[in-house]
Amino acid sequence: MKNKQKTPSLDTIRTEIDTIDTQILKLLNKRAQCAIDIAGIKRTKNLKFHSPERERAVLDRLASINKGPFPNDAMKVIFREIMSASLALEQPLKVAFLGPEGTFTNLAAVRHFGSFAQYIPVESIKAVFDAVEYGECHYGLVPIENSNEGVVSYTLDMFMDCELKIAAEVLLEVSHNLLSKSGEKSRIKRIYSHPQGLAQCRGWLEANMPGVPLLDAISTSKAAEIAAADDEAAAIASELAARLYDLKVIKRRIQDKKNNYTRFLVIAKESPKKTGSDKTSIMFSINDKPGALYEVLYPFKQTGINLTKIESRPSKRRAWEYIFFVDMQGHTDDEKISSAIEKVKKNCLYLTVLGSYPVDARLYKR
């Protein structure tokens, strides 16, 4: 008879996991020391301490060689935290975001920069731009558009009056959750959220919480704060808000439309280098005459450049003068992109490149 291979015992497998964990810890510290050494070289050569294009290259390389079973999405989250912690050993990134803490903007910032950046909530989109422009923060994060509500016009307006660049984009699925102190649906007598949050969950609330008063809060995070102080109140907010205010999740993903996401922009004083999967945003103004917009956009068609978004806004300088915002696939370091932009400039009153930055093809779900 052939000997059957003996299945390892639970204790044996756990011992092996402990050994692997010890090896991982040693390698993490070895990697951290490498990061410290790199920081020293950067200081000596007066190089910028944060290289987002390098971080993107690290994640892309690992994703390309990952054979599983560990999923790439989880791997990227872990390595994002490793890079965030390593960078903090040198100097924590300072990131301004439209506050308060616990909002979806805060969640998007953490997803992009990791848990070890220093996050600074501010009260307005303008304050985010100011914090970066005056050197108080390395980066800022602002909402630019929602799949249901459309473009955030004020963010576009801010680019008209500053020289900051777009350094990245972050796509975040807006997942609304019903939260309370007890986690018991039967105890809820009132529900708080931002008006937009209440509107996006109205169908679920009518079907599952009929007759329960719906009360406005200035933000989803403020709603969570109120619920944390009221045993009979619930909040509609993010899971990050639940963690911040020690609330339990009664029901996840209660929004009526499941395909609801917000695109955020990371702003900085300069854009990153080319990664190979990039997007470029420009802003321009044209003469008010028939066919003017067609003439401006024609060089993009001629060179086969894919325009992914076009928005227009009143310039607020002269009546009936409009500013156009255009996103396209590619980087200004690409000859095709730079050449087309130079041709476009000839038919514009002015044109500004807002930045070239990595495409975020992921849709974070939280």
Outline where the language-model segments fall:
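Domain-level signature for soluble enzymes in the chorismate/prephenate branch of the shikimate pathway
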Residues: 1-366
